Amino acid sequence: MFSKFEFDGKLNPTFVEGAFKLPLSSIRAYLKEPISPRFIHVGSAGITRPDRAGLDLSKQPPAVRLNKELDFILTFKLKQGEDLIRESGIPYTIVRTCALTEEPAGANLIFDQGDNITGKISREEVAQICVAALESPYASGKTFEVKSVVPFSEPFTVDPQNPPPEKDYNVYFKTLKDGITGKEILEHDPVPV
């Protein structure tokens, strides 16, 4: 891109009128340390599993089993969603939820990395996790999966007379590692808190 004028106010001989491009390699301006996420992406647990060697698809959620029939939706979400976010340079958090429910928030949770867990989680809980992540430097640059400990077969309810205590999501965020996307297979146990 060339200016129409040189620094001395004379016409620039290399200037060409028309459209121009200004490519950016990252966006970072005046962010104070420690940096909390500026972008929260809510995605799907199972996103890296369709191409995983040796995976028993019969034990996987429908979206994983049917990725090909669904026009490779999980592959698209990974390559055109998560991977682009990670490459953008914007401080981010990627929250991969298990099956979403209309149950209330408050169940005990399991946060995991490596894209190995299945289960369910309340939409209300996911919203609370996202808000907490926006304020937490511990969540920045992290990709994780989350589910409740309550099995699918059991509904989770809250007694209004005895509601569950508020969660400090930083307890969970502090256990997460940088650079874990699920493309690599992790051999570890999920971290219940």
Please report, for each region that a protein language model flagged, where it lies by residue.
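Oxidoreductase cofactor-interface core, primarily capturing Rossmann-like NAD(P)-dependent enzymes
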Residues: M1-F7, E17, S25, L31-V193
